[in-house]
Amino acid sequence: MIRIVKRNGSTEPLSEEKYNRVVMWGVEGIRNVSASAVAMGAAASIFDGMTTSQLHEALVKSAADLISPETPNYSQVAARLNMFKIRKDAFGEYAYPSFYHHIVSNVSRGVYDEDLLKFYSREEIAELGVYIKPMRDELFGYAATVQLASKYLVQNRVTGEIYEAPQQLYMLVGMCLFQNWEDGCAGKTRLEMVKGFYDVTSTFKLSLPTPIMAGVRTPTRQFSSCVLIESEDSLKGISAASSAIIDYVSRRAGIGIGFGRLRALGSEIRNGEATHTGVIPFLKHFQTAVKSCSQGGVRGGAATAFYPIWHLEVESLLVLKNNRGIEENRVRHLDYGVMINRLMYRRLVRNENITLFSPHDVPGLYDAFFVDQDKFEALYLQYEADESIRKKSVPAVDLFSTLMQERASTGRVYIANVDHMNEHGAFDPKVAPVHQSNLCMEITLPTKPLAFTDDADGEIALCTLSAFNLGALRSLDMLKEVAFYAVAALDSLLDYQDYPMAAAEIPAKARRSLGVGVTNLAYYLAKNGFNYSDPAGNQLVHETFEAIQYYLLDASCRLAEAKGACDWFSQTKYAQGQLPIDHYRKSLDANPDTSFELKMPWEELRGRIREYGLRNSTLTAQMPCETSSQITNSTNGIEPPRGPVSVKSSKDGIVKMVVPDFAALKDQYEYLWDMPDNRGYLTKVAIIQKFFDQAISANTNYDPTRFPGDKVPMMKLLEDLLFAYQQGVKTLYYHNTRDGAGKREDDDLASVALVEPEDECDGACKI
């Protein structure tokens, strides 16, 4: 006889009737699934003395193992069974408990912020508890339940004890963010804001980044997904940057490091008293700082480091991530962003040389690189002609070929087009230039190096993210409401969170920069009858992202009318009366595939912004959504899926995830490796960039088997790089190569794709 150990420690014989009842409940109302298949799959794992929790895990695993392109609905079965386990683990029963008593209990445990009981009365908490919809737990797919249990639900990360369920998470996040909302502000009461925010998040219209999902409602208050830190060219400045990195990595943030100011190897120090050791030793120092903390058990530390392509050490910097070389001349655990501008591309196209300098030797050149392209070119030519300045001249095609080879071989050498970042950005580069991006290449905010650790005159940029789930929108008009809650919540978060450094707090509260993007674009295209490669869907993309930018600006203007414009609004192009529709890359207008009429009432909005200003300096950025897309059961960000079923590899094991509405849309989806090239995808990225005031985590993808000798020609890589630049794309993120990774004997790679875990902004950034 097999005996089962109950939660209270007592034992009882395995009840076949109870066992089958749970299985039947798991499949009830779900089409094209078999209760007997789930029961039989789990039966092989049953053993004498197993706990009820282990028994339930066996049922979940059995259902999850049955997920396939032919039987995608087992994802719902596995999700339902796993959600049952989550709620039993959290509450000891399936039903949600009293919301008030739940909060009191978790505040006393020290896992919830005690302000919840200070800012809300018992009656208000009871009202919000009644508003919670436990049935919305049924909306989660299996991958979502795994992520919730491992990453997002508040828990003891040593014992694994879970303290809450998903609907409480969504309500509590809203309660924390709007605890200081004044009744009547922007025409809404505080409880209306909390309830409205709960509705748009718990129904997946708005996707939240990992730091907010995992952290808001806990005593830890740092939720910006990514942090941008620029290093000064001095020992004190480098030390200050390193200190800031450690501070923020320990608070769940990914890091963007700007080190382009650092002088090159062999430069004089103190008028020749010493010789500079070059950039690489300091990059190793930054790498150690990044890897010093594990981000509270939620994410591993990660950073992208930025430098200009004309830096004197560029030939050594480009190869830092590859597997050749020795430990002394490699810094492999950082990613890299190579910053390029118009003149560098022109030298490439004209088959000319690029001259490399140490920034310290060419006064004004580094700053002009971002602020004024004409001034940069004049200074660059002047310094090229000055024989007294140390320099090196290399063929542009050789330098760019090395760049693209390293990008292809590592996948994680990124591109930042700094002229586009500043000319088609939210800020006036003369007063607030953008010097770098972030970990995942979607954030373009001003930074200023810290001269010393507590330098309040420095500027550390923080990006605060969320994403619209395009698949949940029945019409573009719905964006108005969702955009308002998104902007209001993220704006409130800027005041709610703590800041370890004045150099972050002062600009964060003065600029109030936000980055709202989208997830589920692949599903959105498919359900509307379009795909990535066909330009027929370009007009839909144009109309959708025009509406997104418009409604976000509208929401920020409404908040500015109610609360006041952000303090440094004058440093934006918006303050000069300019909108994204005024300064985008005009090459888009020359192509009928990318030139479409505007549909929104922009001039009326321009007038309101002129009158009230904006609450936020930036509103949009397109981040990766690998993790949060699993929560909302959506395709990742703007990316094409790799197959109808993705096998997500994480620290908690393998999880299968089916694309939305696969049965109905299986012939409409265009999968990553079915795209003939990058042109259709990059064109849609360019259309999105037309409206977005920050940048886009855009990837390039290559299948070597499409080319002679199974090798992607260098000319193809350079063509795509130039095409992206010509279309106004600000940044390029991953370079993905199809190499058969994850292929198993029983899997067709076109159907099942293995997605490896990544260091990430998580997004949020990845969100």
Predicted features and spans:
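A glycine-rich phosphate-binding loop feature that marks nucleotide/adenosyl-phosphate handling sites
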Residues: 41-42, 60-62, 77-84, 214-218, ...
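Catalytic alpha/beta core of large soluble enzyme barrels
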Residues: 119, 124-148, 435, 441-447, ...
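Terminal amphipathic helices with adjacent charged low-complexity linkers/tails
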Residues: 74-107, 340-342, 421-452, 514, ...
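Function-dense linear segments that define catalytic or interfacial modules
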Residues: 154, 161, 168-186, 190, ...
